[in-house]
Amino acid sequence: MAIFEVCGLVKSYGRRRVVDGVDFRVERGEIVGLLGPNGAGKTTCFRMACGLIPPEEGRVILNDMDVTDWPMYRRARDGGMGYLAQESSVFRALTVQQNLLAMMEMLGIDRKTRKARCDELLHDFNIEKVRKSKAQSLSGGERRRLEIARLLVTDPEIILLDEPFTGIDPVTIDNIQQIIRNLSDQGISILITDHQVRETLPITDRSYVVRDGKMLCHGTPDQVIQHPEARQHYFGEAIELNSGGPPQPHVWNRAAESASRHTG
């Protein structure tokens, strides 16, 4: 059953229709990608899904509620939605621990529960060693882990991730991918949009590819990578997916890409 669904989204800027009747859905516990080339309209779709901008037409359904006209804060408070922006959202002058505790205090969680939950999140996200460090001193990976940990304070049922793999090193990317899988295993739904398709597509259960403001295709990673128009206009002909070993169900065949680059 879909926990999150958008139906017939439309958005124009001036005379240009940048999103034209887009539909997509996210099932409970599912990881879904929203992908597409630059200028395709995927970012506008994502921002309408989050509640950052209103659609001209269409509906956004969250937990069986029509939240089309709800601002983001209400979708989080009453609908169980979490959102991680591409830009840093940590309180830079506070320590890692204070970032988590401040969020819990805002929610009215009692002191004893706050401490226990804070310790749990610090451990789960491997940021115990920097618990007393100011957020402004964190590495990109530490900051990203803190942001996701802070999201979980609100116990979201679905998390929307905007460019989660931007500005972090390959080791941290692997770590964030595993965190996303773990969240899915816990029953939390995930919607991701990211320009880093090699990092995003392999961890999704399904993905949607947007082109020219319309939905070009959707399906499993293997299905979308084989779609002729998606390959032509977005993925490229040299990219393949292999069913791979654990913990990643799909890995990119970089050999084909490398061979093409050296012979082309």
Q: Model-derived features: where do they sit?
A:
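The feature captures the beta-strand-to-loop junction immediately N-terminal to the Walker
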Residues: 35-37
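Helix-to-loop junction immediately C-terminal to a conserved catalytic motif
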Residues: 50
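ABC ATPase NBD coupling module
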Residues: 54, 66-82, 87, 111-115, ...
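Conserved ABC ATPase "signature" region
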Residues: 65, 101, 112-130, 177-181
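Conserved ABC ATPase signature
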Residues: 134-138, 142
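Catalytic Walker B motif of ABC-type/P-loop ATPase nucleotide-binding domains
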Residues: 159-163
